[in-house]
Amino acid sequence: MAAKVEPFWKRKTLDRLDAEEWESLCDGCGLCCLQKLEDEEDGSVYYTRIACRLLDLETCRCRDYANRRRSVPDCIQLTPAQAGEFQWLPPTCAYRLLAEGEDLPLWHPLVCGDPQAVHRERISRAGRMLSESAVAEDDWEEHLIFRAG
């Protein structure tokens, strides 16, 4: 009888993942693509329901992922080297969870095999976001949805 092999995210640290493994950790929730506001007094990060102009509001996927940094220069590309700084990511984010020594949730596509689970479980904001072109930046505070960290 063959020994059970643990999934890669349980066997490897973030800095040991290959590019395909790293990308597969993304659950497709799109929350990292929401506009965020930082409290200047305590550094808290607040998520708004206002999405980056490249984010598809229904699928929660970037419409130009490969070239996103050309269109949105301040788009943050997550890397394993930044793992210690992932507190600003949503508490459900696989990158943050693994960086904090936690496991993936049961609804994560790598665990359940269903990429739609993140939407069915309402982890994503699919259908509940606004495009940044629809809201003046001065009004973003009116659209806060949660605090990270």
Curated annotation (Swiss-Prot):
It holds the Pfam family CxxCxxCC. Signal peptide: none annotated. It comes from the Bacteria. InterPro entries: Puta_zinc/iron-chelating_dom, UCP006173. Belongs to the UPF0260 family. NCBIfam families: PRK05170.1-5 (NF003501), PRK05170.1-6 (NF003502), PRK05170.2-5 (NF003507). HAMAP family: UPF0260. This is UPF0260 protein Avin_32930. The lineage of its organism: Bacteria, Pseudomonadati, Pseudomonadota, Gammaproteobacteria, Pseudomonadales.
